[in-house]
Amino acid sequence: MNKLVECVPNFSEGRDQTIIDAISKAIRDTAGCTLLDVDPGKSTNRTVYTFVGCPDSIVNGAINATKVAFKLIDMTKHHGEHPRMGALDVCPFVPVRNVTMEECVNCSKEFGKRISEEIGVPIFLYEEASTQSYRKQLKQIRQGEYEGLEEKLKEEKWKPDFGPAKFIPSYGASVTGARSFLIAYNVNILGTKEQAHRIALNVREAGRGDNEPGRLKFLKGIGWFVDEYNLAQVSMNLDNYRETGVHTVFEECSKDARELNLGVAGSEIVGLVPLEAILMAADYYIAKENLFIIDEALKVRLAIERLGLSSCSFFDPKKRIIDYMVQEDLKVTQPLASMSVRGFVELLGSRTPAPGGGSASALIAAMGAGLGAMTGWMTFGKKKFEALDSIMRELLPPLDKAMRDLIPYIDADTNAFNDYIKAMGTPKGPQRDIAIDKALKQAINIPLSTMKISNTCWGPLLKMAQYGNLASKSDLEVGCKSLETGIWGAHRNVSINLLDCKDAQFVESTTKEANEILKNAQESLQKVLEILSNRKE
């Protein structure tokens, strides 16, 4: 799946719908950005936007929105209940999927540098992007707000990270940085506000004070009573769900509730949640209850049920899980893998250089892993092979994962070839040489990745050959031969492209790695076939 970053800019306008809509349009019109939510507040005179995209697109979206704010918002006339210091007050970048915090820090720095250069405004870094302790938190930087900014900018220690140390009355200054995804999460308690707050004091990081900290890191919380639901809630913010997961919070609150002889009536997530957080919860309950669930949709369903996420209102994964709200159109991102079998085969046989052997090898390897998984499924859950269930639980996940991981390489190989041809067509010069080298190495690394992923299957396949349902013997044989053929085909692509590579060290290390994988595949195939040949009912 592609990289996904969330951006949550707060603009100092919550009353003028024309301006609010203009900023929304700037985000929507940015290629690669998906606007998920617009939340204006009249009393705060502030609007919070939530949009997502890949790292490059997300920065462009933030820049386009800020340019509109620079033109339309006049801070000399701004009044509202919320603290602020600029037309764009704060612009955090948040990792959602396949993105590191470091990449989000880079997004914030690129945004700060580019916007300060393009419209000439002061930009401060905060949270993970800041390296100075006295100006790391938003409240530290924003102290004094817009009204105190002119004098603040005169101090050397408050020199902006980007842009001029100059007060711009109509704009002010902005803060940008990177932070973890914040999850607003409430656990429902059949009790009083005071009892819910007692639980909150037990679990939140701050606890009851410095001398009595709570049990869970990166957690803020209070207790309150919700008349609409007729129950109390432990209302919390998870500042880092990777360190303290939703399931951990639910279990800890439930434990304290039991000790107080209180009932727990599920929980609710307010706003959006990353898929990863839900899958982490599912994996926890799968391990706790010794379940065997591979399918993602079933994992999501399990987490919803165990956490009671639909207890207050229906939890619709398609509308509440951020990854599903920006579901990639596979016909666009993976056109080859989305074709019919007939269509793909006919395209292979057409008068075009791509798709070719590399894409075919990825498909053949994926089918090989798939047939290995099929053998496992034809064994697992059957009364006749009940004694083998624990073994199938071990073997099925890596084969299923390899099958799914290989499918995108059908398109990736063709894309890499096309990028190389494009680089070859650029005008001669140093930039052309750099572009060709980069594209060529990508055209080598893609089939090498096909080999690496495929190579992870041999251990499970050797064991599957020993224990799998013999009624699927021929399926497993075809699968293993397909996997070996896919590896061989990818090896041929690696080898042919290495001939044009001028980086001797890269050629040597890649050749060695590819040859080792091919040798292992050929030897492993023979072992599997021998095991199957010798097995009897």
From Swiss-Prot:
Keywords: Cytoplasm, Cytoskeleton, Folate-binding, Golgi apparatus, Histidine metabolism, Lyase, Multifunctional enzyme, Transferase. Its EC number is 2.1.2.5, 4.3.1.4. GO terms for cellular component: centriole; cytosol; Golgi apparatus. Residues 336-537 are annotated as: Cyclodeaminase/cyclohydrolase. It comes from the Eukaryota. It is found in: Cytoplasm, Cytosol; Golgi apparatus; Cytoplasm, Cytoskeleton, Microtubule organizing center, Centrosome, Centriole. Residues 1-181 are annotated as: Formiminotransferase N-subdomain. SUPFAM superfamilies: Formiminotransferase domain of formiminotransferase-cyclodeaminase, Methenyltetrahydrofolate cyclohydrolase-like. It catalyses: 5-formimidoyltetrahydrofolate + L-glutamate = N-formimidoyl-L-glutamate + (6S)-5,6,7,8-tetrahydrofolate; 5-formimidoyltetrahydrofolate + 2 H(+) = (6R)-5,10-methenyltetrahydrofolate + NH4(+). Signal peptide: none annotated. One of its GO terms (molecular function) is glutamate formimidoyltransferase activity. Residues 327-335 are annotated as: Linker. Its main location: cytoplasm. Pathway: Amino-acid degradation; L-histidine degradation into L-glutamate; L-glutamate from N-formimidoyl-L-glutamate (transferase route): step 1/1. Residues 182-326 are annotated as: Formiminotransferase C-subdomain. Folate binds at residues 163-172. The active site is at residues 82, 413. GO terms for biological process: L-histidine catabolic process to glutamate and formamide; L-histidine catabolic process to glutamate and formate. Homooctamer, including four polyglutamate binding sites. The subunits are arranged as a tetramer of dimers, and form a planar ring-shaped structure. PANTHER family: FORMIMIDOYLTRANSFERASE-CYCLODEAMINASE, FORMIMINOTRANSFERASE-CYCLODEAMINASE. NCBIfam families: FtcD. Folate-dependent enzyme, that displays both transferase and deaminase activity. Serves to channel one-carbon units from formiminoglutamate to the folate pool. In the C-terminal section; belongs to the cyclodeaminase/cyclohydrolase family. In the N-terminal section; belongs to the formiminotransferase family. This is Formimidoyltransferase-cyclodeaminase. The gene is ftcd.
